[in-house]
């Protein structure tokens, strides 16, 4: 599979060349999920990574992609080949990873990488302009908090914003 140092021109197949800011957006999303910084993301993280770019893959699409991936991992060049056409086809109103990351940081006031119950309450008050009851905030958190740890991490935030 590819190495981004070898192929500096990023092309989306059968389409115009990706602009530098589009490459940067793909790079930011890729790096977000390349947690061990080995230049690859696993099939499991690929779906979450795609969602940060505003693309909602079905389980079937992810299974098909995983069958095409050798070794269960995707490097950045393969990621560009996969996501380039989707990025080029996206509509102007789709939210990119940079905007999602900025919004997440606004809510994560202590910068620990998670949105706590208190931070969520403050964010909802700022967004809605009214104070919600403890029960309402708990209900919202339960709906968003997929892993049940009482916090909203970036992936859970992306899923919430994509609904």
Curated annotation (Swiss-Prot):
Q: Name one GO biological process term.
A: sensory perception of sound
Q: Which GO terms describe its cellular component?
A: cytoplasm; Golgi apparatus; perinuclear region of cytoplasm; plasma membrane
Please list the residues that bind Ca(2+) 2: 108, 110, 112, 114, 119
Annotated localization: Cytoplasm, Perinuclear region; Cell membrane; Golgi apparatus
Q: Where is the lipid attached (N-myristoyl glycine)?
A: 2
Task: Indicate the segments forming the EF-hand domain, all copies.
Answer: 21-56, 72-89, 95-130, 132-163
**Is ATP-binding there in the keyword field?**
no
Q: Which InterPro entries does the UniProt record give?
A: CaBP1/2/4/5, EF-hand-dom_pair, EF_Hand_1_Ca_BS, EF_hand_dom
Q: Which CDD domains match?
A: EFh
Name it. Calcium-binding protein 2
**Gene symbol?**
CABP2
């Amino acid at each position: 599979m590819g190495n981004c140092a070898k192929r500096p021109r990023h092309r989306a197949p059968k389409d115009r060349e990706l602009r530098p800011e589009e490459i940067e957006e793909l790079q930011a999303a890729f790096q977000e999920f390349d947690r061990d910084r080995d230049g690859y993301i696993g099939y499991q993280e690929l779906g979450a990574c795609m969602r940060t770019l505003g693309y909602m893959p079905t389980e079937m699409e992810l299974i098909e992609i995983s069958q095409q991936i050798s070794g269960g991992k995707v490097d950045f060049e393969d990621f560009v080949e996969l996501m380039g056409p989707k990025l080029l086809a996206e509509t102007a109103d789709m939210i990119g990873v940079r905007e999602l990351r900025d919004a997440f940081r606004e809510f994560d006031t202590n910068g620990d990488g998670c949105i706590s119950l208190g931070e969520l309450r403050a964010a909802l008050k700022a967004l809605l302009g009214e104070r919600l009851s403890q029960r309402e905030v708990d209900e919202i958190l339960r709906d968003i908090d997929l892993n049940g740890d009482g916090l909203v991490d970036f992936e859970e935030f992306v899923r919430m914003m994509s609904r």
